């Protein structure tokens, strides 16, 4: 199974998702989207595959900032903003053959991977997930 994580190493949730995958025996393809940026096609594919709307895909501050564009359903302007400001996309997104999930909370990752780490599994902040 091919597993891809759209990863922000500055985010504890993203680091936890990556650790969870590797502890599960999965070596994911890591996409450092802050460095590489987003493409129009990537954003549309994530939105479609995750069944999320723009408000759910955005960090809270970006969602507030882009609210007029979201209400106007101005997808082109929203995507252009996200291409210019990749940090505005919520994280982490994980993609497998079973689907795409915004892994907030981290437990959303479980239904799209074939195995999980041994229990107990703790986040870097000490919260038990399994």
Model-derived regions: residue spans:
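Thiol/selenol-based redox catalytic cores and closely related redox-interacting motifs
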Residues: 33-130
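Local sequence-structure signature of Cys/Sec-based thiol-disulfide redox active-site neighborhoods
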Residues: 1-24, 28-33
């Amino acid at each position: 199974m091919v597993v891809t994580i759209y990863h922000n190493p500055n985010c504890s949730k993203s680091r936890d998702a990556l650790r969870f995958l590797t502890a599960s025996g999965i070596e994911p393809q890591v996409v450092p989207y802050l460095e590489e940026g987003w493409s129009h096609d990537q954003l549309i594919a994530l939105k479609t595959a995750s069944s999320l709307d723009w408000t759910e895909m955005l960090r809270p501050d970006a969602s507030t900032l882009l609210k007029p564009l979201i209400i106007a359903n101005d997808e082109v302007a929203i995507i252009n903003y996200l291409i210019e400001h990749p940090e505005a996309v919520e994280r982490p997104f994980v993609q497998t053959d079973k689907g795409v999930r915004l892994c907030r909370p981290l437990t959303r990752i479980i239904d799209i991977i074939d195995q999980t780490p041994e229990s107990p599994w703790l986040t870097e902040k000490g919260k038990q997930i399994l």
